[in-house]
Amino acid sequence: TIYEPENNAFRYLKRKYKNSKSVKFAKILGNKKFDLIVAADVIEHIKNDKQIVTKLSKNLNKNGFVLATVPAFNFLFSKKDLDLHHYRRYSIKEFKNLFKKFDIIKLSYFNFILFFPIAITILILKLIKINFIEEVENKPLNLFNNLFYLLFNLEKKILKYFDLPFGISIIGIFKKN
């Protein structure tokens, strides 16, 4: 079941998955219960993040899972975050504390390989007060997409065995107890 409270995004998802027989849509979650809830780069958009984690818990079956990703490191917070309507970035400690009523299955930074180039770029642009490009033409760049695919696949393999010491984002898998 796909739940998306934002109207434009909801319409987009309905169009994208209109021919899928396995995808259901819910405009209101109500008291529905799920075995898995994925919140990929969602929580940082919500002013009261503790409240949304409580809501996620209420919509999980007993022993259900939340897979969540958020941007990492407050020192990287920039105008781009504001443009994306982010309220915050997280440290591992803050994110762990947010899910303190859950069992932690996995908690790690990710987007580790690109951390230094991205962090340095953000910090330089903040220092010289240049804003990020506001609009990027929406054309796929196959070379970059292929490179990112390879890098993220490599990180996925590393994450099976190790937690990463830093990264642009954090991933957590939490189990309701």
What residues fall within each predicted segment?
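Acceptor-substrate binding/catalytic loop of class I
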Residues: S78-N97, S108-N111
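Short aromatic-enriched loop/helix-cap "lid" or pocket-rim segments at secondary-structure transitions
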Residues: L13, S78-L82, P117-T121
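Short secondary-structure junctions
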Residues: D103-K106
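Conserved SAM-binding loop
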Residues: T1-S78, S91-K96, G172-K176
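Short glycine/proline- and charge-enriched loop/turn segments
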Residues: N74-D81, I130-I133
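A C-terminal cap/extension of S-adenosyl-L-methionine-dependent methyltransferases
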Residues: N111-N177
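Short, hinge-like loop/turn segments at secondary-structure boundaries
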Residues: Y17-K21, L84-Y87, I122-K126
